[in-house]
């Protein structure tokens, strides 16, 4: 009989208290057993407390190089920050600088190691590494990210291998998926060469669409044998989170999908085991 494992991960844990509240609810009422904590998030300390109160929640490090706040002083990582001392707004801006050779890899290493050190100081038993907007899979950055994981004695990493042609929604989305697919294949080879554990399959948002209840049920209906990670960004209040995160995302829909009775019923009916990164073989 096929073995089905579901690994739902809440990204951006610690970014905002309303995200932390959603993570808490999704653990207590739904199928969430994994979250990745943003070291520079404004609600970092709040998220740490949520994690301490929910030991069943596997917590990883959400390496951040865009759309957030650095752990290092801006003067120590000048190629990574704007004149305001924050990261570039999004992956597009970062990649533009990256392709022009304007991102110093020593700055990347310094910042990501500082993020790892901050996570280590929490004393939480960490499970894995991933990143905000998939930046850890860029050439060169993947090598540093794996080094960061190793420095924390971690041997599990997200590789965002998204199918190219499922649920096609236009050329823009296809281009985004093609880029992510290429980076993921290159990153997977490096991760496997260093004996990192990686989920067998990956689902979640690409080009902005939320994993609402219907989408989640579709993922479960077509679940493949092995471990499938579903990347999600739950939150409790779109009206506050959209401007706070500068992202037109349906945080509430993803929270509702995770706690949905229909989702829980399908998980039970298909005998799917809900896991986190600790359970990866």
Predicted regions and their residues:
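Active-site histidine-anchored catalytic micro-motif
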Residues: 131-133
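Terminal accessory/targeting
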Residues: 1-8, 17-128, 140-281
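Active-site pocket-lining segments that scaffold enzyme catalytic pockets across diverse folds
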Residues: 136-138
């Amino acid at each position: 009989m096929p073995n089905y494992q579901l690994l739902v991960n809440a990204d951006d844990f610690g970014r905002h208290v309303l995200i932390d509240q959603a993570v808490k609810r999704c653990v207590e009422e739904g199928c969430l057993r994994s979250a990745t904590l943003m070291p520079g998030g404004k609600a970092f300390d709040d998220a740490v407390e949520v994690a301490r109160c929910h030991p069943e929640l596997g917590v990883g490090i959400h390496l951040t190089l865009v759309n957030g706040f650095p752990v290092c002083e801006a003067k120590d990582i000048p190629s990574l920050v704007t004149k305001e001392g924050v990261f570039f707004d999004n992956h597009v801006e970062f990649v533009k600088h990256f392709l022009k050779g304007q991102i110093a890899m020593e700055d990347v290493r310094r910042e990501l190691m500082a993020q790892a050190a901050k996570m280590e100081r929490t004393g939480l038993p960490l499970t894995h590494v991933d990143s905000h907007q998939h930046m850890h899979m860029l050439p060169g950055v993947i090598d540093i990210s794996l080094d960061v994981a190793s420095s924390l004695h971690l041997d599990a990493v997200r590789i965002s291998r998204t199918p190219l042609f499922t649920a096609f929604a236009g050329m823009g989305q296809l281009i985004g998926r093609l880029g992510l697919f290429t980076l993921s294949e290159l990153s997977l080879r490096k991760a496997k060469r260093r004996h990192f554990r990686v989920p067998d399959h990956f689902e979640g948002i690409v080009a902005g669409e939320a994993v609402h209840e219907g989408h989640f049920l579709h993922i479960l209906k077509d679940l493949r044998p092995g471990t499938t990670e579903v990347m999600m960004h739950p939150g409790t209040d779109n009206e506050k989170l959209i401007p706070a995160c500068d992202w037109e995302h349906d945080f509430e829909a993803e929270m509702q999908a995770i706690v949905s009775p229909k989702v829980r019923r399908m998980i039970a009916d298909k005998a799917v085991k809900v896991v986190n990164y600790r359970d990866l073989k």
